[in-house]
Every structure is written in structure tokens, then in C-alpha cells.
Amino acid sequence: MAQLFFRYGSMNSGKTIEILKVAHNYEEQNKTVAIFTSGIDDRDQVGFISSRIGLKREATPIFSDTNIFEIVANIKPKPNCVLLDESQFLEKEHVFQLAKIVDELNIPVIAYGLKNDFRNELFEGSKYLLLYADKLEEMKTICWFCAKKATMVLRVDDKGKPVYTGEQIMIGGNDHYYPVCRKCHANPPIK
């Protein structure tokens, strides 16, 4: 029985490398995967997932008008698994499409993404994945500043100063975001 998984974690928790590993494991057994990523994440190149350790792979970009269900339903042969990177950027309708892939096509879907933003508020995609996923799995990493578990994301400006207000989505990597614990989010030891 297929299920919808949401594997969430802070920045640097290994979400993208995990997608690449899962895809490799399926393909090593001659099984197919369909890989998707957000079309707004252009840090490396639209239509690719790229891990911080340098591995990169092509993926179908998702935009507002993308119908993920229709794309997957038309893939021949039917994929054995659907993998999504940057799933926090999904819209509510996209999450419903993922559930439909599981329920109607009987294909497991594994979505990876951040749970909360730099203000510690849920992203739209994460909110609906938390509500509709059959299984929730936390991917862990440590705080950038101390040894505690990182559960939040700290945004910094170009001068390295913490930012707690502003637009929810600003694409960036370690130059603007850090995985942090609750204590360091509230009072980061930045000079």
C-alpha cells in the first residue's frame, strides 16, 4: 500500500542527499523514480536538485500551474516512487495532487522540505503535508552555533545580522540561512 511521506528538517539536515540516495537505491534495483523540485528555487539551476556536497540531478520543476498528478499519471512505465525536493514551496493544490498519486495510482510519494521559515511559521506546502501525509519523519541536524538539535532557520542579511521580518521566500543557502536551535534563533551569538 503506497503512502505519502513528509520528511522535514532544518537547513543542512541532508534532505537533498537523501533524495539522491533513495533514487539511487530504486534505480539500482531497475525501478524507476520521478523526481520533482520547486521551480522557484534557482540557486543552482531550475529543473535540478543539487546537494551541498556537490551531487546534482535533473528534476521536473513545479510551478503554480503544474499538475503533478497529470505528469506522473502520464509517465510510462509507471514510476515506482515519486520524490520531491523543496516541498515547502508547494501550494495546497499540489499537496492534494500528491495524495491523489498515492490514493489513485498507488505510487509512494516522499516529499522533503523545511517545516518552518525564518519567522518560525509554517510554509504553505509544509502545512498541508503535515496535515495530509501518512507518515511524518524528522531529519535532524545540529545548531550552527551550539550542539543542540536545530529545529529552526535563522535568516541573516548581507551584513550577517539576524532578520525576523520580511518576505517568507528568499532563495538562498548558507550565505543567508543557518540551521539553529530555539535558543540561538531568539538570541544568535553573532557579532
From Swiss-Prot:
<dbReference type="GO" id="GO:0046104">
    <property type="term" value="P:thymidine metabolic process"/>
</dbReference>
<dbReference type="InterPro" id="IPR020633">
    <property type="entry name" value="Thymidine_kinase_CS"/>
</dbReference>
<feature type="binding site">
    <location>
        <position position="146"/>
    </location>
    <ligand>
        <name>Zn(2+)</name>
    </ligand>
</feature>
<comment type="subunit">
    <text>Homotetramer.</text>
</comment>
<feature type="active site" description="Proton acceptor">
    <location>
        <position position="86"/>
    </location>
</feature>
<comment type="similarity">
    <text>Belongs to the thymidine kinase family.</text>
</comment>
<keyword id="KW-0808">Transferase</keyword>
<dbReference type="Pfam" id="PF00265">
    <property type="entry name" value="TK"/>
</dbReference>
<feature type="binding site">
    <location>
        <position position="143"/>
    </location>
    <ligand>
        <name>Zn(2+)</name>
    </ligand>
</feature>
<dbReference type="GO" id="GO:0008270">
    <property type="term" value="F:zinc ion binding"/>
</dbReference>
<feature type="binding site">
    <location>
        <begin position="9"/>
        <end position="16"/>
    </location>
    <ligand>
        <name>ATP</name>
    </ligand>
</feature>
<dbReference type="InterPro" id="IPR001267">
    <property type="entry name" value="Thymidine_kinase"/>
</dbReference>
<keyword id="KW-0067">ATP-binding</keyword>
<keyword id="KW-0418">Kinase</keyword>
<keyword id="KW-0862">Zinc</keyword>
<dbReference type="GO" id="GO:0005524">
    <property type="term" value="F:ATP binding"/>
</dbReference>
<dbReference type="GO" id="GO:0071897">
    <property type="term" value="P:DNA biosynthetic process"/>
</dbReference>
<feature type="binding site">
    <location>
        <position position="184"/>
    </location>
    <ligand>
        <name>Zn(2+)</name>
    </ligand>
</feature>
<dbReference type="GO" id="GO:0004797">
    <property type="term" value="F:thymidine kinase activity"/>
</dbReference>
<dbReference type="GO" id="GO:0005829">
    <property type="term" value="C:cytosol"/>
</dbReference>
<feature type="binding site">
    <location>
        <begin position="85"/>
        <end position="88"/>
    </location>
    <ligand>
        <name>ATP</name>
    </ligand>
</feature>
<protein>
    <recommendedName>
        <fullName>Thymidine kinase</fullName>
        <ecNumber>2.7.1.21</ecNumber>
    </recommendedName>
</protein>
<keyword id="KW-0237">DNA synthesis</keyword>
<dbReference type="InterPro" id="IPR027417">
    <property type="entry name" value="P-loop_NTPase"/>
</dbReference>
<keyword id="KW-0963">Cytoplasm</keyword>
<keyword id="KW-0479">Metal-binding</keyword>
<keyword id="KW-0547">Nucleotide-binding</keyword>
<feature type="binding site">
    <location>
        <position position="181"/>
    </location>
    <ligand>
        <name>Zn(2+)</name>
    </ligand>
</feature>
